[in-house]
Amino acid sequence: MRGLRPALSTFLFLLLITGGVYPLLTTALGQWWFPWQANGSLIREGDTVRGSALIGQNFTGNGYFHGRPSATAEMPYNPQASGGSNLAVSNPELDKQIAARVAALRAANPDASTNVPVELVTASASGLDNNITPQAAAWQIPRVAKARNLSVEQLTQLIAKYSQQPLVKYIGQPVVNIVELNLALDRLDE
């Protein structure tokens, strides 16, 4: 019985620290130092939430830049079903999916002169990626320019404006947030 009291005291102390103090402290510090990120990096226009800067959306029209394909089942870009397709590189089903995506992109982008960028036909590990390279966005310019009656130069400048450089120059590559880019396109129409 004597050994039970110190064990129970230690258990209750650690329960209080790890189950109460630590979560409350990290939540408070996150809200204080990084309020936008701690609340989901939501993109707002007025009182309306238009999306999150962290999760891709299913932009399908010709007047929008398209992101990476979603690997989530049933509903594209469903954050509650995050996860990759888990298809191995040697799986014939993956080859079929990529071939179908390439054919669809070629049909939607007949004026594109180079090969389809790889990130437009392969899903990310989370299945929710919202970023593509500026080169993949530029590949789609002829289709978007035609659908929105905008010049190639206007769209090139917009891509440059919404391109984000890596924190460390030699680690990573520049990316374009598709959600922010497409919302900027919608604002041009207003």
UniProtKB/Swiss-Prot annotation:
* InterPro entries documented for this protein: KdpC
Where it sits in the cell: the answer is: Cell inner membrane
Self-association state and partner proteins as the record states: The system is composed of three essential subunits: KdpA, KdpB and KdpC.
Assigned protein family: Belongs to the KdpC family.
Q: Give the bilayer topology.
A: Single-pass membrane protein
Does the entry feature the keyword Cell wall biogenesis/degradation, yes or no? Answer: no
Protein's name in the database: Potassium-transporting ATPase KdpC subunit
